[in-house]
Each structure stands twice: as C-alpha cells, then as structure tokens.
Amino acid sequence: MHELSYATSVLNAILDAIKQQETLGRKVIKVTDINLEIGDLTLLSVDQLQFVFEVISEDTVCNGAELKAEMVKPKIFCMDCEFEGNLDTKDELEVRCPKCESVNVKLKGGKEFNIVNATIEFDDEE
C-alpha cells in the first residue's frame, strides 16, 4: 500500500506550509480541503489515499480536511509517426501508439502527483 507514503508526503507538505505561515504571525484554525493532481500511472487508489490521510491527519489541523483528486491521463509521443496525445490505459504491459501501432513511444505524463492547492482557515483577528 504505497498510498501511505503519498498521504504522509501530502500531510508533511501541508504542515510545513502551515509552519511557514505561523512564523509570519498567522494563526491557522484548520485545513478544509486539499486538491491533488494524480497521474493514472501512479496506480494509486484515491479511496485508499483518502482513508489513509484521514487516519494519519487525525491529531493535526488537517483533521477533517477533504482530499480531492483530479486524475491525469497519460500522454505519449510516438517517435515514428510523431503522434502526440492521450494514452488509453489498458491492462497491457506494452504501450503502443494508437495511430501507427509503434512501440517506439515516450511517456509524457501520467505519473504526476502534485498538490494543486489547499484551503486553510486563518484566525487573523487581533
């Protein structure tokens, strides 16, 4: 279950960002949601990622934060016919160009795992 390491990375990144804000004198109340961009080729289960995040963030300001994920389709570039576009992911190990059937292709995406943004509530009242 590699979802645990990904969820831990997200939590640590958000907590680091919160520490930076706190050094600027801002008081964080809570994190309400976190938006992710996840490539299909990471083979992550979003449901498992959300569950694990819920468990590990329990005693933090991220407790209750909604983890949202936008899945990113893999893209390929064919070295033979120069086709560039989305790759239809099937249960096959061999990747072929959908235009010419060549296996001489380069992956150009689909392995992403990015934090797009997070909504953080601050207590800025003095």
From Swiss-Prot:
InterPro entries, per the entry: HypA/HybF
Write out the GO biological process terms.
protein maturation; protein modification process
Please verify whether the record's keywords include Metal-binding.
yes
Which domain of life does the protein's organism represent?
Archaea
State the UniProt keywords alphabetically: Metal-binding, Nickel, Zinc
| Residues the record lists as binding Zn(2+) | C78, C81, C97, C100
Against Pfam families, the record matches this protein to:
HypA
**Which Gene Ontology molecular-function terms are recorded?**
nickel cation binding; zinc ion binding
Q: Which residues are listed for Ni(2+) binding in this entry? A: H2
Q: Which family does it belong to?
A: Belongs to the HypA/HybF family.
Task performed by this protein: Involved in the maturation of [NiFe] hydrogenases. Required for nickel insertion into the metal center of the hydrogenase.
HAMAP family, per the entry: HypA_HybF
Protein name as catalogued: Hydrogenase maturation factor HypA
What is the scientific name of the source organism?
A: Methanococcus maripaludis (strain C6 / ATCC BAA-1332)
